[in-house]
Regions:
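Short, low-complexity N-terminal regulatory "tails/caps" that precede and couple sensory modules
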Residues: 1-56
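Intrinsic disorder/low-structure terminal segments
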Residues: 9, 29-32, 84, 215, ...
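Alpha-helical transmembrane segments and their juxtamembrane interfaces
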Residues: 15, 21-23, 125, 212, ...
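Compositionally biased, intrinsically disordered low-complexity regions
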Residues: 17-20, 25, 211, 221, ...
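… and, occasionally, acidic/histidine-rich disordered N-termini of signaling adaptors
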Residues: 33, 42-230, 282-302
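C-terminal catalytic subdomain
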Residues: 168, 222-231, 236-302
Length: 302
C-alpha cells in the first residue's frame, strides 16, 4: 500500500526545516524533520536526530515503567472461593497516581485502592514505594487500621518530600465471608446489597502523610451472596461531559445498581462504559481507577 503524506515546511528557532521549496518528495514523516530546506540557518542533522532519539528513548522508558507499575499491582481479575475481584486503572498521563492492588494469601485477599497526590512520573515513582510498604505491612494478622497507621507513620517521617495519599484498604476473608476495611481519607466505596440497598464505607481516618499520630479505625461487614462492593477514585466522580457537568456520586450509585452483572469483571467494564458514554469523547483530566468485589449469587436448582 502506498502511503501519501501532506508535508509543509516547519519553522523553528533554527530557521525553516522540512520539504524543499521545489517540491522534492519526502519519503517519511521522520525525513520531514531531518531534511533541511535550502535556507541559510538550519539545525544540524545530528541535533535533530538526537532530539528525536531522546524522545523515543524516553517513551520506551515510560512504557517500561508502566509495565512495572502494572506488575506490582497484582492480577487484574481474581477469584477466591465464591468471591470475585476485578480492577482497572487508566492514567491521564503515562504513569498513574491512582493505584489498585490485589494480593492473596490462602483464603485472605488484601484489596487496596488509593490516590497519590499529583500525576505522572513523580506519582508513579511513589507508587513503587507504597507497593513495598503494602507488602511489608500487609500480613494476614494485620487488620487494615494497623496497616494504615504504619503507612501513615512512614509517610509522615518522609515529609516534606512524601506526597499525601488517600487509600481504602480491605482485608477479605473468603472463608468467613467478611470484609475488614479502613478508609484513609478516600471517597467512600459503595456497598450494593443484593436486595438493592446501598451503603457507603466511611470508617477509617484522615488521609495518609498529613498527621503524625493520627488514629485509624477498622470497619467490618459481611458480604452476602449477590452483594457487590465498588471502590473508585475521584477521576470517576469528576469526569465531565461536553457541557462540563460532573459524573458525580449519585450517578455512580445509580449506574452501579443498573449495570450490575453476574461477574465482577463484567460489572466493572459496564460501569467504565457508562462513564465513557457520559464523557462523550471529552479527554481524561485525571487518573481513573475502579475496583469491584462481588460474591456469587445463590443459585437454586430446579
Amino acid at each position: 500500500m502506498l502511503n501519501t503524506y501532506r508535508v509543509v515546511p516547519f519553522d523553528s528557532k533554527y530557521g525553516t526545516i522540512g520539504p524543499n521549496h521545489n517540491g522534492t518528495t519526502v519519503h517519511s514523516l521522520f525525513q520531514t524533520f531531518v531534511m533541511p530546506a535550502p535556507v541559510s540557518s538550519v539545525p544540524p542533522h545530528d541535533d535533530v536526530y538526537s532530539l528525536l532519539r531522546e524522545r523515543i528513548d524516553l517513551h520506551a522508558q515510560l512504557s517500561d515503567a508502566v509495565q512495572i507499575q502494572r506488575k506490582l499491582s497484582g492480577p487484574r481479575v481474581l477469584r477466591c472461593g465464591d468471591w470475585q475481584f476485578a480492577r482497572e486503572v487508566f492514567a491521564a498521563r503515562f504513569l498513574s497516581g491512582d493505584f489498585t492492588t490485589f494480593s492473596q494469601e490462602g483464603s485472605r485477599v488484601l484489596a487496596v485502592l488509593g490516590d497519590i497526590a499529583g500525576k505522572g512520573v513523580a506519582a508513579g515513582m511513589w507508587f513503587t514505594h507504597l507497593a513495598g510498604l503494602l507488602q511489608s505491612c500487609g500480613r494476614p494478622d494485620f487488620d487494615p487500621a494497623r496497616m494504615t497507621s504504619e503507612i501513615n507513620r512512614h509517610l509522615c517521617y518522609l515529609q516534606p518530600v512524601a506526597p499525601f495519599v488517600t487509600a481504602f484498604l480491605a482485608q477479605i476473608d473468603c472463608d468467613l465471608d467478611t470484609i475488614t476495611y479502613c478508609n484513609a481519607g478516600h471517597f467512600p466505596p459503595i456497598l450494593l446489597r443484593a436486595d438493592g440497598r446501598t451503603e457507603l464505607l466511611e470508617k477509617g481516618g484522615p488521609l495518609l502523610g498529613a498527621l503524625e499520630g493520627a488514629e485509624f479505625q477498622s470497619g467490618e461487614l459481611m458480604l452476602e451472596p449477590g452483594d457487590t462492593l465498588v471502590a473508585y477514585s475521584d477521576g470517576i466522580l469528576e469526569c465531565r461531559d461536553t457541557a462540563g457537568e460532573e459524573f458525580g456520586l449519585d450517578r455512580l450509585m445509580a449506574s452501579a445498581l443498573e449495570v450490575k452483572q453476574p461477574s465482577a469483571h463484567a460489572t466493572l467494564m459496564m460501569l467504565l462504559a457508562t462513564v465513557q458514554d457520559f464523557a462523550n469523547g471529552s479527554p481524561l483530566s485525571d487518573d481513573v481507577s475502579l475496583t469491584v468485589i462481588q460474591r456469587d449469587a445463590e443459585t437454586t436448582g430446579l
